[in-house]
C-alpha cells in the first residue's frame, strides 16, 4: 500500500478520463471507483471540461453526451450540478432504454409477437404435460388466454406508452422488463439501431455499471466492439454489486484497447473503517483504498452474541449504549432523531421480520424474477397496493374527499375518455366511482384488517383500478375455481403460487412494507441505502432472521461449513454464497463516516471470534462479548 501521499492523489484520474473522451480519438474505459471515492465529483468535472472543449461542436451536429445513472436521485443530482445543460442527456437506465426504442413501433410489435408466441407455446406444452382440471391447469389456461388477448390488441396499437417511474398497465404499455429486453435486442441485432445510437451519443457514460442490467451492458459492449468511433465509459466497483441482475466480474477481462483508471482515495470513511474494508476485500480481489490524510481514526467494534437469545432489541440498545461510552458520542443514544444511528441489516428478510411483514416478503422473494422489483418497490403487483389502494384508504380514513377524488380520477379506468363516452351523463360515472370506493372502504369497517385477496377481488369486481398482469389470473378466478384442489406435483406455477401466498396476508403488511421501502423506519439494507452514508452505523449479521440461501455470515465467519452447492460453484468458477456475503459485508461497513458497530448473532461464538482475529478484521480489544453489555 502507498504510504506517502496527499489528498490530491486522484487528481490525475480526471485528466485520464478526459483524454479518453476525445471526439477525434475516442477510447473506452472502466473507472474503478470504490467507496467514497468522489466518483460523482470526477464525473461532473470531466463533463464540464467536455462542454468547454466540445460543447459547440456537439450542438452544431445535434449530438449529446449520454449519462446513465442507477437512481432518480443520482440523475437529479448530476443534472443539478451540470445546471440543466442540454449538452448532456442524463437519465436512468429505463428512461434511456425507452428513449432509444420509443419511436420504433413496428419493430416493438414484431418483438412482442415473437415473444408472446414463444411464451404461449411454452405454456401450451406445459399444459399438455400437466394434469387437467387442477387449479394450476385452470390458471395456466387463463394465462394463455391473457397472452392471446394481448397479441390480438397489437394491431390496434398506434403508439406504445411507458412510464419509467410508474405503472404500465394499459393495453399499449410496455413493462420495465420489456423495455430493457427490447432495447438490448435492438442494439445487438439491428446494425442501423447501433448507428443511430452512436450518431446521437458519441460518448456514453454509465454510473454504477456493476448493477446496471447485464443484458443491456452486454449489448453496449457489442456496440463498442463494432464501432471504435464511440466511447463507452463505465464507472463502478465489482465489490459493490448488490443486485443479482448486474453483470458479474465487470471490469475484468476487458478488451485490450480499454483504459482502466483507478481512484484510490476514500473520502468518506475514517481510517479504521478503511482498514477494515480493505481486509474484508483482500480475499476477493486485493484492491485497497487509502483514507484521506486528514481523516480521524474512527471506531469499529464487533459484538458476538449467541443466536438463541430472545431479547435482540434490548441487546442492540445496550450495544448503542456501549458505543456511546466508547466513542464519547451521545448521539448513539441521546438523540430525538431515531435515524441518528442507522441500523443496516444483511438483507430485507431481516428487516421484514423485525417490522412484521416477513410473510408477505418471503412469499414473493421465492420467485427470482420478482426479487429486484420487491427490493426497490417497483413490482407491479405490489405497487397496485402501495400506490393505488394505500393512498386511497389513507385519504378516506382522514376524511379527505378531495384527495380521494384526485386519486380516483387520475388512476381509475372509469374516468378514461372512452369510458366516459359510454355514459350519457358524467354524473353516472362519478356515482359508479363513489359506489366502488365505498364498497372497497367497507372492507375496513369495525377496524377490520382485510386480506389482500379480498381487496383484489373487490376492485376486480368494481373495476375501480386496472388489475396488473401478475394478478389477473387470480382476480379472474370464479367461486367454482375455489373448490378445485390442486395436485402436489411440480406442475404448480411458482409465480401464481407466490402471489396466492402473498395475497393471503393482511393489508397491515403492505403498510409496514411501504414504510420500509420509503425509508420511514430505522432499518436499512445494503440495497435500500445505495450511495448513502451515515455517521453512526449499527450493522446486524443474523442468518436466522435473514432466511436467505443466497447469503450466510455463518459461512463467511467459519461457523458453518460450505454447502455442496457452494463447493460445486467453486469448481466451475461460479459465485458462491460466501462471495456474495463478503460483498454485502463490505458494502454495509463502508457506509460509516465516524463509528461502526457490528453485531453478529451466531451458533458458534468461538468460531466467529477466531475467524475475525485470524483474518485480521478485528483486534481482540475490538471484539466484545454479551456479558460486557448492560442489558435493560
Annotate the PLM regions:
Residues 1-632:
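The feature marks helicase ATPase cores and/or their adjacent C-terminal helical subdomains
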Amino acid at each position: 500500500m502507498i504510504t506517502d501521499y496527499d489528498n490530491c492523489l486522484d487528481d490525475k484520474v480526471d485528466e485520464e478520463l478526459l483524454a479518453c473522451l476525445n471526439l477525434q480519438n475516442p477510447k473506452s474505459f472502466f473507472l474503478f471507483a470504490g467507496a467514497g471515492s468522489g466518483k460523482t465529483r470526477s464525473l461532473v468535472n470531466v463533463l464540464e471540461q467536455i462542454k468547454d472543449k466540445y460543447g459547440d461542436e456537439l450542438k452544431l451536429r445535434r449530438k449529446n453526451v449520454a449519462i446513465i445513472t442507477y437512481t432518480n436521485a443520482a440523475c437529479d443530482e448530476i443534472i443539478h450540478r451540470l445546471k440543466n445543460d442540454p449538452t448532456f442527456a442524463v437519465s436512468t437506465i429505463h428512461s434511456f432504454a425507452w428513449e432509444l426504442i420509443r419511436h420504433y413501433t413496428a419493430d416493438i410489435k414484431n418483438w412482442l409477437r415473437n415473444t408472446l408466441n414463444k411464451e404461449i407455446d411454452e405454456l401450451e406444452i406445459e399444459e399438455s404435460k400437466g394434469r387437467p382440471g387442477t387449479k394450476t391447469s385452470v390458471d395456466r389456461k387463463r394465462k394463455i388466454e391473457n397472452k392471446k388477448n394481448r397479441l390480438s390488441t397489437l394491431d390496434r396499437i398506434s403508439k406504445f406508452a411507458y412510464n419509467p417511474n410508474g405503472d404500465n398497465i394499459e393495453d399499449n404499455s410496455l413493462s420495465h422488463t420489456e423495455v430493457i429486453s427490447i432495447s438490448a435486442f435492438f442494439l445487438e441485432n439491428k446494425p442501423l439501431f447501433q448507428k443511430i445510437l452512436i450518431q446521437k451519443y458519441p460518448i456514453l457514460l454509465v454510473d454504477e455499471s456493476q448493477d446496471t442490467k447485464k443484458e443491456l451492458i452486454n449489448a453496449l459492449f457489442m456496440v463498442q466492439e463494432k464501432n471504435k468511433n464511440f466511447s463507452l465509459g463505465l464507472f463502478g466497483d465489482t465489490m459493490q454489486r448488490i443486485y443479482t441482475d448486474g453483470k458479474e466480474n465487470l471490469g475484468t477481462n476487458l478488451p485490450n484497447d480499454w483504459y482502466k483508471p483507478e481512484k484510490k482515495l476514500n473520502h468518506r470513511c475514517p481510517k479504521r473503517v478503511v482498514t477494515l474494508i480493505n481486509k474484508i476485500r483482500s480475499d476477493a480481489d486485493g484492491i485497497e483504498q487509502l483514507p484521506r490524510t486528514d481523516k480521524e481514526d474512527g471506531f469499529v467494534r464487533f459484538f458476538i452474541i449467541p443466536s438463541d437469545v430472545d431479547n435482540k432489541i434490548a441487546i442492540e440498545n445496550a450495544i448503542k449504549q456501549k458505543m456511546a461510552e466508547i466513542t464519547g458520542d451521545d448521539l448513539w443514544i441521546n438523540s430525538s432523531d431515531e435515524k441518528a444511528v442507522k441500523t443496516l441489516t444483511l438483507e430485507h428478510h431481516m428487516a421484514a421480520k423485525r417490522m412484521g411483514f416477513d410473510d408477505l416478503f418471503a412469499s414473493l422473494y421465492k420467485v427470482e424474477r420478482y426479487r429486484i422489483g420487491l427490493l426497490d418497490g417497483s413490482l407491479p403487483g405490489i405497487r397496485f397496493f402501495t400506490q393505488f389502494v394505500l393512498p386511497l384508504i389513507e385519504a378516506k380514513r382522514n376524511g379527505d374527499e378531495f384527495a380521494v377524488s384526485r386519486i380516483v380520477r387520475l388512476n381509475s379506468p372509469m374516468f378514461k375518455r372512452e369510458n366516459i363516452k359510454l355514459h350519457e351523463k358524467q354524473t353516472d360515472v362519478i356515482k359508479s366511482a363513489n359506489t366502488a370506493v365505498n364498497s372497497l372502504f367497507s372492507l375496513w369497517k369495525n377496524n377490520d384488517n382485510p386480506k389482500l385477496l379480498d381487496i383484489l377481488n373487490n376492485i376486480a369486481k368494481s373495476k375501480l383500478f386496472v388489475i396488473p398482469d401478475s394478478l389477473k389470473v387470480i382476480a379472474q378466478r370464479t367461486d367454482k375455481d375455489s373448490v378445485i384442489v390442486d395436485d402436489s406435483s411440480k406442475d404448480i406455477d411458482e409465480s401464481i403460487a407466490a402471489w396466492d401466498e402473498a395475497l393471503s396476508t393482511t393489508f397491515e403488511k403492505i403498510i409496514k412494507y411501504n414504510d420500509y421501502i420509503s425509508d420511514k423506519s430505522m432499518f436499512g439494507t445494503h440495497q435500500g441505502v445505495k450511495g448513502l452514508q451515515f455517521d453512526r452505523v449499527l450493522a446486524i449479521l443474523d442468518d436466522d432472521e435473514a432466511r436467505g440461501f443466497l447469503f450466510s455470515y455463518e459461512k463467511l465467519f467459519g461457523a458453518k461449513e460450505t454447502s455442496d452447492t457452494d463447493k460445486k460453484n467453486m469448481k466451475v468458477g461460479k459465485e458462491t454464497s460466501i462471495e456474495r456475503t463478503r460483498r454485502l459485508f463490505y458494502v454495509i461497513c463502508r457506509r460509516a463516516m465516524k463509528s461502526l458497530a457490528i453485531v453478529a448473532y451466531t451458533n458458534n461464538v468461538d468460531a466467529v471470534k477466531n475467524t475475525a482475529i485470524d483474518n485480521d478484521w478485528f483486534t481482540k480489544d475490538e471484539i466484545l462479548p454479551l456479558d460486557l453489555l448492560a442489558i435493560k
